[in-house]
Structures are given as structure tokens and as C-alpha cells.
């Protein structure tokens, strides 16, 4: 049974304001048993022999485990993060078994002997080195680190390892960090608000804000400077929308259940672009 409809109800509402790992864990709780059964049978997730479903299950298991490692980097997972994680799981009506499975994967990443580099190299292998999927994985980890509003130096160190093993330079990571931090502020400042519909899912509704700080965050979210010309602005927008195009990501291996997640990310990008267009008078 697909449970992403449950995830969507809170996923992006908490993406930049709460415990991101909990939201993803809801989906992983559904997928984890598949990965565990395959691991117990001695299956090795390599691009050549694994089915797409198997690779997808491994992708999510690893994503949640690495999030646990990121969260633990600063010494302990904060009380606020735990409370938000529990609240998210309760709101999504997870079964006790699903909660245990999600928590098990997260705890695995928190262990001091968690094989971070090996796990990341495996992710790079099972994705076939596809840039968009690896970028998506990196963005998940950044979102986990920024969930409580601040990135601890130890979390930043772990993120540098994640980026390195996935094939991203330190400069690329720092740019992504700036973009995600801007997205956090953009959401907190009113760029995004969510409301529940029918009790089953949450639809993001973007709201425009014309304050100087919101505009600055919109530029940073797109990864461009405030003095960028219209051509540069449009090119940055097209590039980001192409990288986060739901259909393209699914075609490259992202589970179909996560298509709506990619759609929400695209909405975030579009909201920033629309604000800049309005302020600049771009047609």
C-alpha cells in the first residue's frame, strides 16, 4: 500500500521548520522492510543486478540512516526534533511496526561505527552516478541538518563528507547550503504556508512577500546575486526547474511515490522566481 499521501500532509510544512527526517521516515517505514528482507538474503545493491524497486528501497533506507548520522553529529538529537518526529508520525497514523522500522533505520545511522563513506559510495553506485538523484540525496541531508534552524559545525563536517562521496565539491555544497538556508528563511518569512485538505494531505500554497529580506532570500534560493540580469535569472530558474522536474527524477530512479515531493520543491523554486519577476518587472 502506498502511504505517500500521508507523508504529503506534513512533509514540506515541516521541511524547513521541523524534523525533516521524520517525514521521510514515514515513507521509509513502508519501504524499509523490503530493503531489510533483501539485505538479509545477502542481496547486494549494485546497478547491474538490482531491479529499480530494489535500488529505490536501498536509496531510502540509506537516506534515513545518513540523516540519523547527520542529526547525531552535534552530540545528540534535540528534544524538539524528537517531539516533532513523534508528532509527525502520530499525525500520519503510522502503525507501531512502521514506526519501529523507521526508528531502527535512523538509529542505525546514529551508531558511532556507522559506515558513512561505504553507505554513500553504495548510493553513488546504485544511482549510476546520476547527478539529479545524488543532488536530491544531498538536499535531503542538508534539510535534516537545518531542520532546527541552525547547522552545527559538526553537522557541516558530516555534510562535507556526504558531498565529497557523492561527487560534489566543497563549493557546490556551500552553495547548496546557502540556498537551503535561504529557503528556510523564505518559508519562515511567509513565502510558503500549508493547509490540510480533507485530513489526508497538505497542499502547499505559496504567498508572495515583497520585503527586502524575502527578496534577498529568493535570490539566494535560486543561487544568484541580487544584481543578476533578467537573462541570468531566467537561466537559473530553468536550470533548477529542470533538475527538480518530477517526471525526470522518477525516470532516473526516484520512487514514483516521491513525485509530489519533487513537485513541492519545484513550487518553492517557482515562488522565489515569481517574487523576483514581480520586483524586477520581468515578463
UniProtKB/Swiss-Prot annotation:
rRNA processing among keywords: no
Biased composition (Gly residues): 188-197
SUPFAM superfamilies (alphabetical): Chaperone J-domain (SSF46565), TerB-like (SSF158682)
Biased composition (Low complexity): 198-210
Keyword hit for Electron transport: no
Xref: SMART domains: DnaJ (SM00271)
Cell compartment(s), UniProt: Cell inner membrane
UniProt signal peptide: none
UniProt keyword annotations, A-Z: Cell inner membrane, Cell membrane, Chaperone, Membrane, Transmembrane, Transmembrane helix
Parts of the chain on the Cytoplasmic side: 31-283
Residue spans crossing the bilayer: 7-30
Membrane-related topology note: Single-pass type III membrane protein
Ranges facing Periplasmic side: 1-6
Domain notes: The transmembrane domain is a dimerization domain.
Subunit structure: Homodimer.
Protein role: Regulatory DnaK co-chaperone. Direct interaction between DnaK and DjlA is needed for the induction of the wcaABCDE operon, involved in the synthesis of a colanic acid polysaccharide capsule, possibly through activation of the RcsB/RcsC phosphotransfer signaling pathway. The colanic acid capsule may help the bacterium survive conditions outside the host.
Identification of the protein by name: Co-chaperone protein DjlA
Source organism phylogeny: Bacteria, Pseudomonadati, Pseudomonadota, Gammaproteobacteria, Vibrionales
Amino acid at each position: 500500500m502506498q502511504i505517500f499521501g500521508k507523508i504529503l500532509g506534513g512533509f514540506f510544512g515541516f521541511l524547513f521548520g521541523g524534523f525533516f527526517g521524520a517525514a521521510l521516515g514515514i515513507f521509509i517505514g513502508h519501504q524499509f522492510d523490503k530493503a531489510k528482507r533483501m539485505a538479509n538474503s545477502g542481496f547486494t545493491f549494485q546497478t547491474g543486478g538490482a531491479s529499480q524497486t530494489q535500488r529505490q528501497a536501498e536509496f531510502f533506507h540509506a537516506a534515513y540512516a545518513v540523516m540519523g548520522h547527520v542529526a547525531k553529529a552535534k552530540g545528540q538529537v534535540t528534544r524538539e526534533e524528537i517531539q516533532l518526529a513523534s508528532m509527525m508520525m502520530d499525525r500520519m497514523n503510522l502503525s507501531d511496526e512502521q514506526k519501529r522500522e523507521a526508528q531502527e533505520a535512523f538509529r542505525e545511522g546514529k551508531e558511532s561505527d556507522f559506515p558513512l563513506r561505504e553507505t554513500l559510495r553504495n548510493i553513488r553506485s546504485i544511482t549510476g552516478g546520476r547527478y539529479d538523484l545524488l543532488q536530491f540525496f544531498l538536499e535531503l541531508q542538508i534539510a535534516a541538518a537545518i531542520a532546527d534552524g541552525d547547522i552545527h559545525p559538526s553537522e557541516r563536517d558530516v555534510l562535507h563528507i556526504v558531498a565529497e562521496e557523492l561527487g560534489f565539491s566543497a563549493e557546490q555544497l556551500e552553495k547548496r547550503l546557502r540556498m537551503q538556508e535561504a529557503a528556510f528563511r523564505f518559508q519562515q518569512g511567509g513565502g510558503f504556508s500549508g493547509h490540510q485538505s480533507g485530513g489526508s494531505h497538505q497542499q502547499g500554497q505559496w504567498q508572495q512577500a515583497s520585503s527586502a529580506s524575502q527578496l534577498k532570500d529568493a535570490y539566494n534560493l535560486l543561487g544568484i546575486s541580487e544584481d543578476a540580469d533578467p537573462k541570468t535569472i531566467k537561466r537559473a530558474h530553468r536550470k533548477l526547474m529542470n533538475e527538480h522536474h518530477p517526471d525526470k527524477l522518477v525516470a532516473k530512479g526516484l520512487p514514483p511515490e516521491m513525485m509530489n515531493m519533487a513537485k513541492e520543491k519545484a513550487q518553492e523554486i517557482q515562488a522565489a522566481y515569481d517574487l523576483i519577476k514581480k520586483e524586477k518587472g520581468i515578463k
